[in-house]
Swiss-Prot record:
Main location: virion
Protein known as: Minor outer capsid protein P9
Species this protein is from: Rice dwarf virus (isolate Akita)
Similarity comment text for this entry: Belongs to the phytoreovirus minor outer capsid protein P9 family.
Keywords recorded for this protein, A-Z: Capsid protein, Host cytoplasm, Outer capsid protein, Virion
Sequence segments annotated as region (Disordered): 245-310
UniProt signal peptide: none
Record carries keyword Transferase: no
Cellular component per GO, a single term: host cell cytoplasm
Free-text function comment from the UniProt entry: Minor outer capsid protein.
Biased composition annotated in UniProt, kind: Basic and acidic residues: 285-297
Annotated compartments: Virion; Host cytoplasm
């Protein structure tokens, strides 16, 4: 594959950031989605750098919301091959320094190159481990792998569920997410920082609500499915999320008119959300506070947190593919065996 020149490398990451900035929930369900096609194209050209690019998109404020919608889509889609979008292509890394190129891309797009979320160390470790593991384990051989795609689907959904739950747990207190804000003493800078804080807080609350409602809908749809892979995934979600007990419960969330149309009436056991004390302040309230405030800049992030850009390198899958239960291949239908429709499967080519 060789190393990419900076211009081409920036173009690849540019496409990923821009796609996640504009990503809408449900893109995976659409045939010929431009967003999914673009991400597939980027994935096909960045080799082993794919998990690092996804990690940067997770932690940068501009792409965080879109990336999490993308993960929710994969976790709850009926397309059993969609998880392959997390797998890398090939065995080479065409980037000399992914983080440096990502920074250059942010500047090229007019984004701040230091607006990265600072997650707690434990979640940073888990997130990096997850993305690195999926880079290898979400691959599917196009010649032989499609015949056991449902087996891998169950394992990947269990892994993704654990990632979403780790995110949900880590974001119970959203205050730490704004530790990256370091404004100067000017009122304009403080106002800008406060607005960004409100935006990030709102996005995290929205993601938390989307996770619970979409997981609940998936369970309602597939817990009694005649197809074992859907039924097994739904059972795993039920065990991870304890939806019947209402745990975990979603944080209060402001009313929003969202283009992704979150699930309506997910069921009596679904966690509920309402407006409350944690609702982000609007711009006018923030402006008034800044004008009258005599305090200095916001406090720095606690020492217990570490920058997510300092993720420890870790490559270890969270689930062994060797533990697949017996009999999983028996439910393959004749159509699956003789005429695979890769578009319907949502399968991303690995080569």
């Amino acid at each position: 594959m060789g190393k990419l020149q900076d211009g081409i490398a920036i173009k690849r990451i540019n496409d990923a950031i821009t796609t996640f900035k504009n990503y809408k929930l449900g893109e995976l369900e659409q045939g010929g989605s431009m967003a999914i096609n673009t991400l597939s194209n980027v994935r096909a050209h960045v080799g082993l750098a794919w998990p690092a690019i996804l990690r940067n998109c997770l932690i940068h404020t501009s792409s965080h919301l879109g990336f999490m919608k993308f993960m929710i889509d994969i976790a709850t889609t009926w397309k059993v091959g969609a998880f392959t979008l997390l797998g890398s292509v090939g065995d080479e890394d065409p980037f000399t320094d992914v983080d440096l190129i990502y920074t250059k891309t942010c500047l090229h797009l007019g984004l701040k190159d230091n607006d990265f979320l600072q997650f707690p160390e434990e979640f940073a470790y888990e997130a990096n481990s997850f993305l690195e593991a999926q880079s290898m384990n979400a691959r599917v051989d196009m010649l032989t792998g499609v015949h056991n795609i449902e087996d891998k689907y169950v394992f990947r959904m269990q892994s993704i569920s654990k990632f979403l739950k780790a995110y949900y747990t880590a974001s119970e207190d959203v205050a730490y997410l704004t530790g990256f804000i370091k404004p100067d003493d000017s009122k304009d800078s403080i106002l800008s920082a406060e607005l960004l804080k409100a935006q990030v807080t709102s996005e995290v609350l929205r993601v938390r609500n989307l996770i619970t409602t979409k997981i609940q809908k998936y369970i309602n749809l597939y817990e009694d499915s005649q197809l074992p892979h859907f039924r097994q995934a739904a059972l795993s979600y039920t065990q991870d999320w304890d939806v019947d007990g209402g745990v975990p419960a979603a944080l209060p969330q402001p009313d929003t008119t969202d283009d992704e149309n979150p699930v309506a009436n997910p069921g009596p056991s679904a966690p509920t959300v309402s407006k409350g004390a944690d609702q982000p302040e609007d711009e006018e309230m923030i402006r008034k506070k800044v004008e009258t405030s005599k305090d200095g800049p916001p406090k720095a992030v606690p020492s217990g947190n570490v920058s997510a850009r300092g993720f420890p390198a870790f490559l270890e899958d969270d689930m062994s593919e060797m533990d697949a239960p017996d009999g999983f291949h028996d439910y393959l239908t004749r159509e699956h065996e003789n005429n695979f429709d890769l578009t319907q499967l949502g399968l991303a080519p690995s080569v």
